[in-house]
């Protein structure tokens, strides 16, 4: 049981690392990107209006 939970945690961490870009791998943009709206983030996660995902 312990090994299974550890495996699940490892899989989750690997998924996060895969989706996260290293800052030095990003191509520099000419225009500064505005800070993302937290509501926009929930909107992208498709959690619906109840979670502040009003698009």
Curated annotation (Swiss-Prot):
Main cells of the accessory glands of males (paragonial gland). It comes from the Eukaryota. It is found in: Secreted. GO terms for molecular function: hormone activity. Keywords: Behavior, Disulfide bond, Hydroxylation, Secreted, Signal. Its main location: secreted. GO terms for biological process: regulation of female receptivity, post-mating. The modification Hydroxyproline is found at residues 28, 32, 34, 38. Residues 1-19 form the signal peptide. GO terms for cellular component: extracellular region. The keyword Ribonucleoprotein does not apply. Disulfide bonds join 43-55. Represses female sexual receptivity and stimulates oviposition. This is Accessory gland-specific peptide 70A. It comes from Drosophila simulans (Fruit fly).
């Amino acid at each position: 049981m312990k090994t299974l939970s550890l495996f699940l945690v490892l899989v989750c961490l690997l998924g996060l690392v895969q989706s996260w870009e290293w800052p030095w791998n990003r191509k520099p943009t000419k225009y500064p990107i505005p800070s993302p709206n937290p509501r926009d983030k929930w909107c992208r996660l498709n959690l619906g209006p109840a979670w502040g995902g009003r698009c």
